[in-house]
Amino acid sequence: MGHTKRNKTGVLLMNLGTPDAPTTSAVRRYLAEFLSDPRVVEIPRLLWLLILHGIILRIRPAKSAALYKGIWTEAGSPLLAISERQQAKLQGYLDEQQLTDKNGQAVSVHLAMRYGSPSVQQTMLQMHQAGIDNLVVLPLYPQYAAPTTASAFDAIAKTLSQWRYLPSLHFIHTYHDNDDYISALFASIKADFDTNGMPERLLLSYHGMPERNLHLGDPYYCFCMKTTRLVIEKMQQQGLVFDSDFVVTSFQSRFGKAKWLQPYTDVTLEALASEGVRKIAVACPAFSADCLETLEEIEQENREVFIHAGGESFRYISALNDNDDHIVMMANLVKPYL
């Protein structure tokens, strides 16, 4: 393809990834790729690889496969199915609004997963072959974190390092305080309250990370707390009345024995129930699409924790997924770079 024909803009949506199937072998392949990323596990490389291949990949895949089986749908992995809908709806919205690039050409929307399929390398090759020379990357991690956002950038950079002709690159690294994002979160919470009534507490559960990462300079914790603060402010602006302890922030999905960001979600739910809280709603602002960590860990596992500790009503508020206001948010995020 001649360089004169390379005059197109493409948007690349990225998320973490998923096994191809809820089987032990598929989960083992996925975990091997995911847990081999030095951004994800920051301990001496040789030691970790020995632990990973000698212990974890022998034990964890079968257990995880059983959990994936519990959330698998006819469309396959919920995360992948939702991500594909996000891609299609964003493409439809850009076309409908006639949002073109600076050359007046239509913008194409693509999808890649950091681990698993569709891979970053495969998707970017397709974009390259389509003549895209202005690349806008939107990792769907609202709060920047090195293990997620920076790892997504690593994958982009690794792929581009093999190319001779590089595109212009715009990488949207965080949107934790974006007005459209906060408004979309509020709308999903308000819709639940309108349908089911006000709970006694609203728990905002974010994905956790080792506390060490915070001390090393990762802003993730601060970004999560800012998201919570802005959601509270939005709720107050919209006239919701609640006590100062109504919204609680916690962190889930801890792995290993190291100290992670606290308070932990399961411990928090147990404590709230033991204190007499009977009705709770839980939202997970760090997840742009429902996945194992929301559909199984929160909606099933942590529901049991709360009910077992004396709670009576546990409501999980779905991720923003392919909600219309979430798609508009994505469009507004990428629009300045088209």
UniProtKB/Swiss-Prot annotation:
One of its GO terms (cellular component) is cytoplasm. GO terms for biological process: heme biosynthetic process. Keywords: Cytoplasm, Heme biosynthesis, Iron, Lyase, Metal-binding, Porphyrin biosynthesis. InterPro entries: Ferrochelatase, Ferrochelatase_AS, Ferrochelatase_C, Ferrochelatase_N. Pathway: Porphyrin-containing compound metabolism; protoheme biosynthesis; protoheme from protoporphyrin-IX: step 1/1. It holds the Pfam family Ferrochelatase. Belongs to the ferrochelatase family. PANTHER family: FERROCHELATASE (PTHR11108), FERROCHELATASE, MITOCHONDRIAL (PTHR11108:SF1). This is Ferrochelatase. It comes from Shewanella denitrificans (strain OS217 / ATCC BAA-1090 / DSM 15013). The gene is hemH.
